[in-house]
Amino acid sequence: MDRAIIFDVDGTLSETEETHRRAFNRAFQGAGLPWHWDRQLYNKLLAVTGGKERIRYFIESFDAPDVPAVDLDDFIPLLHAKKTGAYTEMVSNGEVELRPGIRALIKDARAKGLRLAIATTTTPANVDALLAVTLGGSRDFEVICAGDSVANKKPAPDVYVLTLERMGLPA
């Protein structure tokens, strides 16, 4: 029987949420928005998975000031792209590390013949940046399902089901 380990990224491979929060704030500043997510607010916003979804939730549920008078379906992806750019730059500058023991766990799992994959709601660019800086790339992972590869984000199991399908493993 094939055995596999499927990793999430944020909070599993690495503690990234503070870096994500700061990247959102850089994106807001770069877009000329007066928004600032402090830690307390960001912890509330983490109830929603997905960066684009989190921005929409903030706008619709927290009386965001100075929301541009544009179609949010167009605006949010552009703003999120700025956030992704800020985040990947921060990761490339070494601001994010693997959690202790992760590198050894991956090495041991590979040595034992376990198959490895990633199932996450973060964007592919974020995953690529983290893996490039911390592990020298994605070669240890057979499958990476990230971002908008599924319609329903966590806690829905869709990204895990898709990962298992791509690995040829039963759910």
Spans of features found by a protein language model:
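N-terminal helical cap/lid subdomain that shapes the substrate entry/recognition surface
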Residues: 2-9, 13-100, 107-112
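Substrate-recognition "cap/lid" segment bordering the active-site pocket of phosphatases
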Residues: 93, 123-171
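Substrate-recognition element of Asp-dependent hydrolases with the DxDx(T/V) motif
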Residues: 24, 102-132
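Conserved beta-strand segments that form the floor/walls of ligand-binding pockets within enzyme
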Residues: 6-8, 117, 145
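Alpha-helix N-cap/helix-start capping motif
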Residues: 17-18, 49, 121-124, 157
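Long alpha-helical scaffolds
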Residues: 4, 117-119, 164
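Residue-level detector of short coil/turn "hinge" positions at structural boundaries
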Residues: 35-37, 66, 116, 138, ...
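Residue-level marker of regulatory loop/turn positions in helix-turn-helix DNA-binding domains and
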Residues: 98, 119, 152
